[in-house]
């Protein structure tokens, strides 16, 4: 795809995710792989439901802006680490939904486990509900390099991992294409809502 086409994918993703309430106001950040050594990311501080072509920028995979005057998200390193360690990844989405934020704060453990949900099959490589989808939860940290360093061992040890939560913050997920990442966002949000409702019903 051309840069213009990839930028449009980011713009359309922003409108969709904002419309679902998963990327309110200027929260969240999105990216696509531009080349083997570059990514396109949302510019810092932009309303995700109102993105335009000037609201994306190219960075190298060290997270440095390649476009003077444009500032990438503070969390750029969390995107580029995925492009570096997983060559098959073509898009990364970070959202700030209510369910992801609340569930990550309510969960004392360092991970969530989902099993016996038919929608688990929305994740790449999952063929049956008789399986587990494990979602790690990392404590929030304003030092993004340190946070990325905390995430890396999990990514290395769990190649099947499709996403993770940052406590009190939001969700990261990724896929070979933007459509794959968006599909997984929807699946995660369904599972998060189910888990919260189960906890309410069961008084957990």
Curated annotation (Swiss-Prot):
Alphabetized GO MF terms: methylthioribulose 1-phosphate dehydratase activity; zinc ion binding
Co-factor: note: Binds 1 zinc ion per subunit.
Keywords: Amino-acid biosynthesis, Lyase, Metal-binding, Methionine biosynthesis, Zinc
Binding site for Zn(2+): 94, 96
Catalytic activity reported: 5-(methylsulfanyl)-D-ribulose 1-phosphate = 5-methylsulfanyl-2,3-dioxopentyl phosphate + H2O
InterPro entries: Aldolase_II/adducin_N, Aldolase_II/adducin_N_sf, MethylthioRu-1-P_deHdtase_MtnB
Biochemical pathway: Amino-acid biosynthesis; L-methionine biosynthesis via salvage pathway; L-methionine from S-methyl-5-thio-alpha-D-ribose 1-phosphate: step 2/6
EC number: 4.2.1.109
A cellular-component GO term for this protein: cytoplasm
Top-level EC class: lyase
Keyword Metal-binding annotated: yes
Cofactor field: Zn(2+)
Stretches assigned to coiled coil: none
GO BP, sorted A to Z: L-methionine salvage from methylthioadenosine; monosaccharide metabolic process
HAMAP family according to UniProt: Salvage_MtnB
Function: Catalyzes the dehydration of methylthioribulose-1-phosphate (MTRu-1-P) into 2,3-diketo-5-methylthiopentyl-1-phosphate (DK-MTP-1-P).
Family of the protein in this entry: Belongs to the aldolase class II family. MtnB subfamily.
Protein known as: Methylthioribulose-1-phosphate dehydratase
Organism, scientific name: Pseudomonas syringae pv. tomato (strain ATCC BAA-871 / DC3000)
């Amino acid at each position: 795809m051309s840069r213009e086409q990839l930028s449009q994918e980011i713009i359309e993703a922003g409108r969709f995710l904002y419309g679902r309430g998963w990327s309110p106001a200027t929260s969240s950040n999105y990216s696509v792989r531009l080349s083997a050594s570059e990514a396109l990311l949302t510019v810092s501080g932009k309303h995700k439901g109102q993105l335009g072509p000037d609201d994306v920028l190219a960075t190298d995979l060290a997270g440095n802006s390649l476009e003077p005057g444009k500032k990438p998200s503070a969390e750029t390193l969390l995107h580029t680490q995925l492009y570096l360690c997983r060559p098959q990844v073509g898009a990364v989405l970070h959202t700030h939904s209510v369910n992801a934020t609340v569930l990550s704060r309510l969960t004392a453990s360092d991970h969530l486990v989902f099993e016996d949900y038919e929608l688990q099959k929305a994740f790449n490589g999952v063929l049956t509900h008789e399986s587990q989808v494990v979602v790690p939860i990392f404590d929030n940290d304003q030092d993004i390099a340190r946070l990325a360093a905390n995430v890396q061992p999990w990514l290395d040890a769990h190649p099947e991992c499709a996403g993770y939560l940052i406590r009190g913050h939001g969700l990261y997920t990724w896929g070979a294409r933007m459509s794959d990442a968006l599909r997984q966002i929807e699946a995660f949000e369904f599972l998060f809502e189910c888990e919260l409702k189960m906890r309410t019903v069961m008084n957990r």
